[in-house]
């Protein structure tokens, strides 16, 4: 029996904050995400996310597996954060960060096991085509993605609003499916 604990879902917030509270905090959640500490201490959200990203991503993650090139892992995370919601191949990522496909696959597998990112395969009625299609990568939490990019600008000043919404909706759907 395995249970996955995700960042707080909109459904959970609805129970504690009500519909009005959920609507009022929506932009904040698109930018800062839904980790419990971030929700409970909104004034310190940036600092909490930077600390979480640095300790969780770099200390805990590097201790978990023998990551020989931590700088490369950082570059890969940045590349994934910049290309969130876009179809991307391992080959393209390898070229972007300057390594081989095998290393990219290993690091992405590690990031998935640590519940930082998840991937969705493209859909096709032809199974062979579906297997060949590039994947889309998403972050479990928008706040972690934005901490990696060091971008907490308001939605009105951002170029990636569509990507933030898509990542938010997909991660919310994932939570709803897991908790159902």
Q: Where is each model-derived feature located?
A:
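Helix-loop-helix "sensor" segment of P-loop NTPases
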Residues: 14-25
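Short, glycine/charged-enriched secondary-structure capping and boundary segments
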Residues: 1, 19-20, 152-154
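Accessory nucleic acid-recognition modules appended to NTPase machines
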Residues: 39, 43-180
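A generic structural signal for short hydrophobic patches within well-formed alpha-helices
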Residues: 10-13, 144-145
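A short helix-turn-beta junction within AAA+ P-loop NTPase domains corresponding to the substrate/partner-engaging
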Residues: 1-11
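Phosphate-backbone binding and catalysis cores of DNA-processing enzymes
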Residues: 2, 37-39
